[in-house]
Amino acid sequence: MIFILLFNSNLRSQTEQDSLITKNKYGIRIGLDISKQIRMLTEEYNGLSLYGDIKIKERLFIVTEVGRDNKNLNNENIKSKFSGNYIKTGLNYNLYNNLPGLNNEIYVGFRVATSKFESEVFEYSIYNKDQYWSQDRVQDNILHKDLNANWIELIVGFNTELANNLFMGASLRLNRMIRQKEPANFKNLFVPGFNKVTENNNFGTAITYSIIYQIPIIKK
């Protein structure tokens, strides 16, 4: 009888300890980069960027981002439009030590990115170093198709769990252009996914703000 009581007591104790063990959730997360929608309020721009990741180890995530950008540019030298799609893939590594039951992240990561796009020039000025008076702008619709670019991104960011499986995040990105196809006699002033391109400078920066939802698959 005493052995039975001791066994039952140990069983209850083990059950209580097991109930206190918090299991980590593994699943697919999908999200929206809302910085695109914010830009649409202040610029001649529209775009959409979707985010997806999956945890493959305790701190390691495989990440894919796909999107589309349409950007109008108008300055003293040129009036043009750039539009196209892009895809980015890479890894995030979580540096943050969570308390049991929490799923917050402070991470570093990288992306390898590619974009396919086209540009349309509506007006432009011809530069002449010997000209003293301002040049009238030439009006001529010129469409450049089949443009492309490749670059890499280094990233620092965070994701915080607002509610069960719902996250908000932000990231700062340093971009390095690797290769781009440019139209004859013109430059790519904007590359979808990379953002602004400046002459003789292959670097760029970007900030993202994201809302992310996790579809839990397993806990372990």
PLM features: residue spans?
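Short glycine/proline- and aromatic-enriched beta-strand/turn motifs that initiate or cap beta-hairpins
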Residues: 12-55, 65, 210-220
